Swiss-Prot record:
The gene is rpsK. It comes from Salinibacter ruber (strain DSM 13855 / M31). Part of the 30S ribosomal subunit. Interacts with proteins S7 and S18. Binds to IF-3. This is Small ribosomal subunit protein uS11. GO terms for molecular function: rRNA binding; structural constituent of ribosome. Keywords: Ribonucleoprotein, Ribosomal protein, RNA-binding, rRNA-binding. InterPro entries: Ribosomal_uS11, Ribosomal_uS11_bac-type, Ribosomal_uS11_CS, Ribosomal_uS11_sf.
């Protein structure tokens, strides 16, 4: 191997210099098990994302409003540093962290222009899972 060849070593991920418009979209997917927050530009290109699992929560703690708040805060701070200022929020799913994620994004400095619920509703499609007996 040559002296300048550094294969096999750990690579440090480099931040891309992304030019971000001030307007964008925030997608909050709140399932029964996790919360995923994705911030994109107007064209759907991802600027930043975070989930309760990425924030270090495991198991049943991932679907708490506090975990959703931390995920929303992390994604919003990263996008704010890149220049995002105003978002339209699209919420999907029945999870408990919907409001917490939106509140955290607005407290992080992002202006929430609108909130839309895009939860898919079946027109009597698949049979739902059986009820839990605890």
């Amino acid at each position: 191997m040559a002296d300048g060849d550094d294969r096999g070593g750990k690579r440090t991920p480099q931040k891309k210099n992304v030019v971000v418009e001030s307007n964008g979209r925030a997608y909050v997917k709140a399932t029964f098990n996790n919360v995923i927050v994705t911030l994109t530009d107007q064209y759907g290109n991802t600027i930043s994302w975070a989930s309760a699992g990425k924030m270090g929560f495991k198991g049943s703690r991932k679907n708490t409003p506090y975990a959703a708040q931390k995920a929303g805060e992390s994604a919003a701070n990263e996008a704010y540093e890149l220049g995002l200022r105003r978002v339209d929020v699209y919420v999907k799913g029945p999870g408990s962290g919907r409001e917490g994620a939106i509140r955290a994004m607005s407290e992080s400095g992002l202006e929430v222009a609108s909130i839309r619920d895009v939860t898919p509703l079946p027109h009597n499609g698949c049979r739902p899972p059986k009820r839990r007996r605890v």
